[in-house]
Amino acid sequence: MGRVYNFSAGPSCLPEEVLKDCADEMLDYKGTGQSVMEMSHRSSAFKPIVEDAEAMVRKLMRVPDNYKIVFLQGGGSTQFAMVPLNLGIRTGKAVYVDTGVWSGKAIKEAKKYVSVDVAASSKDRNFCYIPKIDKITGDYDYAYICLNNTIKGTHWNYIPDTGSIPLVADISSCILSEPLDVSAFGLVFAGAQKNLGPAGVTLVIIRDDLITDSPQKGTPTMLTYKTHTDEDSLYNTPPCYAIYVVGKVLHWIEKNGGAEGMKARNYAKAERLYDYLDSSAVYRATADKDSRSIMNVPFLTKEKDEAKADAINKKFTAEAAKAGLVNLAGHRTVGGMRASIYNAMPIEGVERLIEFMDKFAAENF
């Protein structure tokens, strides 16, 4: 069959141009006679790959000179532990904002290592909005937010003022979807499998003053940021091929206008889909308008009966898949459907989805 439109929350679709480029180099990377998959991470052929990926991150995200960039393993979930282990060393206290499943998991993990205060939460309305916070104050080692919430489809449309408290952000599902002022944060991290590349590599950008050789007692060597910043992501064998693909994606982003180009592309897609949902008599978006994500769009039908709604949702996703629109099922905690429209999703995918939604509505409501 032909290529489908993949609306998965992650791993997600990659630019077709990048996939073809990788395919062309699969058996022979730049005349080396081998695939990057087979290459030693200590070889002269691989070192430029990781250096280029780092340089492209610094260029596209305008990362200041006093920040280090590393490619790690373990996904964003490992960062839930690395952050408190490395940053929670002065007062042993941190402050989090709870905006959904992923910030909730981060809070649960952090409590093993530091005392956690929750500055605000949107749990009261099933995480369908981002709380308004004027300023976060207190004697904390760091403050933590999840900038974009894939499951509930919400996004911070402002950066909270934390004063001198280093701000940490999980930007896994929105990295390079639009410009971001990295200097407003002490540390940001992103699992690659949504907007940067395939699963298996995690990008961390950390300010120099937060890199310590004295993390919490008992912190494993592999969970110490300095271990990796000192060795330029090559302390141990990195996910070589994943980093290689990330580099390709970063060059694709640059070719398509960089972060500003991605912003224009993504807002066009999101506005088209939200406008359709807001004008529909059958479908509705679940996130508050002032908190909506341009990356993840959960939606429900007007069916109120739970059993009937569940049947309708299953029928929708099954028929959508037959039409070449895959991975549209909503998260089990939300139900309904979810369209993840990351950087690589073309506007044509959104148009095809809307056409299908119209047809499905006409036939079932």
Task: Tell me the role of every PLM-derived stretch.
Residues 2-4, 322, 331-365:
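PLP-dependent enzyme catalytic core of the Aspartate aminotransferase-like
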Residues 283-320:
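Conserved PLP-binding catalytic core of the aspartate aminotransferase-like
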Residues 32-79, 100-101, 109:
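Conserved N-terminal alpha-helix of the aminotransferase class I/II PLP-enzyme fold
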Residues 3-54:
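A glycine-/small-polar-enriched, mobile loop at the entrance of the PLP active site in fold-type I
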Residues 10, 110, 121-175:
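Active-site phosphate-binding strand-loop segment of PLP-dependent enzymes
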Residues 15, 187, 192-274, 288, ...:
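Active-site C-terminal subdomain of aminotransferase-like
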Residues 77-143:
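PLP-dependent aminotransferase-like
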